[in-house]
Structure formats: C-alpha cells, structure tokens
Amino acid sequence: MGRTKARRKQASKADNFPSSATAPAPSTSAQAPPSVTVEALLVQSAQRIAALDYDGAKKLCFQAVQLANRELQEKGDGADPRMLRDALEILGTVELELGDITEAKEHFAASIQLASATPDPSPAPHLYLAQLSDTPQESLTHFGNALGILQAKLAALERAKLGVDGGAGTQEELEDEGEIRRSASRALVGMTELYLTDLCFEPEAEQNCEKYLKQAAELDPSDPEVYQTLASVRLSQQREEDAKQALHKGWEIWRNVEVDSPIYPPRPSRLTCAKLFLELSEHVPALEILNRLENEDDEDSEVWYLSGWAWWLLGEARGDKPRAEDEESKEECWSEAKLCLENYLRLEERDPTGSDPEQMSHVKELMGKLDAAGIVASNGAEGEDGGWEDASDEDAMEQ
C-alpha cells in the first residue's frame, strides 16, 4: 500500500455547491448589441465557463441580465421572467467561482424571487444559498424549499410516465430523473448534517436525522453520501459497528468507479469519508482514499497530515504481531508516516497563513517520536519498472 511521488493539482471549482424582482443593476459598460439575444449570451457564457474564463463569463452574464431585464420591462404584464431568472442564476454560479460571495447571494435571491412567478422554479439557487446562509435556520429553509421543488418535479415525471395529465414532463426531464433524485437526496443529507452540527441540541434532532436519511435512501439508494452521513449519525449514537457498516456500504458504491462518474463524490466528501474511517480505526481504507487525494493535489497540507497520522496509527496497530506477506511492518508504516509529515511541514513552511496550531503541534509531537525511534522517511512507492517515479518523469511521458 505504497504511494508514488507523481503528483498533480486539479483546478479548483465550486463543485462543493450543488448543479416584484428587479435584477441588480449591471455595469453600464457591458451593453449588449441590439441583435444579440439573452439565450445566445448565456450560451457564450457557458462556453467561457467551460474554458475556465470566469471573468469573461461574468461580463456575458451581466449583458444577459441587462438585456433580459430590459425586455421584461418593455413587455410589461404577462411577460415571461424565466430568461432573467436563468441569467441571474448562472451569474451567481460564476460569481461563486470568482469568490464574489456577497454578489452571488444577491443574484441567487433575485432569481428565487423571479421564480415564484414561474411554473417551473429551479432548485439550484436554494441549494447554493443553503450552503451560503448565515444561520442554520436559514440554511434549513433553503434546503427544504429545494427539496419541495425537486419532489414536485419527480411527481410530474411520475404522472408523465402514467400519462395522467397529458404529457407533463418533457423527454429531457424523464432522462434527468436520476439527477433530480440525486439532488433531492443531497438536500436531505444537508438537512441531516445541520441537525448533526448547528441544530444538534434541538429536541427533534435525532428523529429528524433518521427520517431524512431514510427518505434520502429511498429517493437514491446509490448515493454514497447518504450512507456516509448515516455513519456520522451512528457515531454520534456510539453505535460504532453500525457506523462501520454504513461507511463501508457508501464507500463500496464509488470505490472502483471512474473519477468522471456522476457517482464519484466531490473531494470534500471523500476527505470526510477518510476522516470517518480514521475515527473508526479503519486505517487501510482511510489510507486508500487519502492516497488518491494526494495524487490529485499534492499541495493540500491537511491530506498530508491525515495520511501521516493514519500511517502512524496503522504502525501502532501492527506492532510486532505476525503479519501477512503483503502487509507493511510497523517500521514501514512509520517510515511512510514520516514522509507524509515532512511533506506537511514543507507546505506549512512555504505558506504558513491559515496554519492550524493544534495540527502543527501534533505533527511536531509525532515527528519527535519518529526521530526517537530512528525512523527514516520513505522514498515513496516503486514504479512498474522498479524505479522511482517523480513529477518530471510523468511530465516527460505526457509530452
């Protein structure tokens, strides 16, 4: 269970957030040509987003908002506000990517206000605002509103399948049923997490956790985050064996799938999964997840800290007991631990801003114990040809 020294860093994205209103006044320097349509501007902004040109996408979204707002005012009563609603929602997502949180919240709120006058409101602004809310009660309200919209969409799809109301629900909506179920499941998971944390002292907290996760599992039994969150609930109830069972069930869903699969959880969720495995003394699966996270981004100091701690704990658990042929000895585990902790210290030395004092103190304590035991840091894992891989070797192969 070694590692390679080959590393790559992924571009950061806002993936951790889910997929009478007057539009906020856009910049007057971003006037749209008269022949351009709102839809065309939004298509162009989507192309800029795909190219990670968020500044360019924001300018196009501003133009779309301005044009849609002007058209809405010109048409007066009976005008369709959906284009403006969609433009505001897309603008908010772009602003999230740029870190403009206050502006994003304003535009999501404006989109929601417009959506109240449409027959097909979008759940996305509510899901975003649930993550950005200032209070747990506000967050819970947004999750609940998003869930209501998603449940209405699912009900419309069911009626369409049965032909009850003459074809409610388009073919595209029918094909998107899995995505709708996943979004509803994630809303319920979000509500559960609120009752596990900020609202944990509410008298109905435990009951709501059980209720929401049961609903989520019924909506989308293939969502690994349902079982991961259930593991957290079981841990809070001191039911460790049940927690292990739930966590392994969730992990097995995505363990062997490709990273571009819709089932594959986002990075923060996988990091939480690793932490839960560590809390349950399940060191080997924790290290498997952490090693993947290292390979995705070798500049995440928290991952190096957790990897070092996991290897240390695994070495302690192995001790001097007889081991299987393919198992690392205590000394080998601790050698890996020292490599990880040295990487942590290098990153913290390079950029100490935001450093966690407790984490740093723990790392120094572990390093002192490893030094006292005469442990030398591992060199990494051997490549297939028996040599050591490094970043320059991989770069040369890709050229």
Please give the residue ranges for each predicted region:
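Structural motif corresponding to the intra-repeat A-B loop/turn of tetratricopeptide repeats
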Residues: 51, 98, 133-136, 198, ...
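Short coil turns that delineate tetratricopeptide repeat
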Residues: 69, 82, 116-120, 151, ...
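Amphipathic alpha-helical repeat scaffolds of TPR domains
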Residues: 36-43, 81-93, 119-137, 178-199, ...
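Amphipathic alpha-helical segments of tetratricopeptide repeats
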Residues: 65-68, 72-73, 112-113, 147-155, ...
